Amino acid sequence: MRVLVVDDDEIFCRLLAEILEGQGVEAAWTTDGLAGYEMASRHHYDVFIIDVRMPLVLGTELAEALKKDHPFAKIILVSAFADETLLNLCERIGFPVLSKPFSARHLLEAVESILANSVKPEGSNSPR
């Protein structure tokens, strides 16, 4: 499984990558939302973990663009500012939110949950 973490906090990116890699997941990361979009166009990722508040592009905007280009993308948003307005927006656009700080267990459960609820495109037996 491949996961892309997009968050403007490099230490947070490295921490999530370490947690995921400890479970045998191939994790890539970037601190730039636009670079994350570019990485997604060049490589296949099973799950995207995206911070909501980043410079240049909001995580919700990046998530919507990724979903448009990759309809079967599995996306989890993360935020230290997960208020009711954000939670309602994310529910409306269909992305789960993890509120920072969260435990490694909650991260892994969120990834497992989003994959368990996934629908594969017709004719797709394996990732690209």
PLM feature segments, named:
Residues E61, F81-L98, R105, E109:
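Alpha4 helix (beta4-alpha4-beta5 surface) of REC/receiver domains from two-component response regulators
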Residues H44-I49:
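Active-site beta3 strand of CheY-like receiver
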Residues D9, V52-R53:
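The short loop immediately C-terminal to the conserved phospho-acceptor aspartate in CheY-like receiver
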Residues D32-A35, V57-L62:
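Acidic catalytic/metal-coordinating carboxylates
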Residues C13, P55:
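The feature encodes the CheY-like receiver
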Residues G24-T31, M39:
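Short hydrophobic/Thr-rich beta-strand motif most characteristic of the beta2 strand and flanking loop
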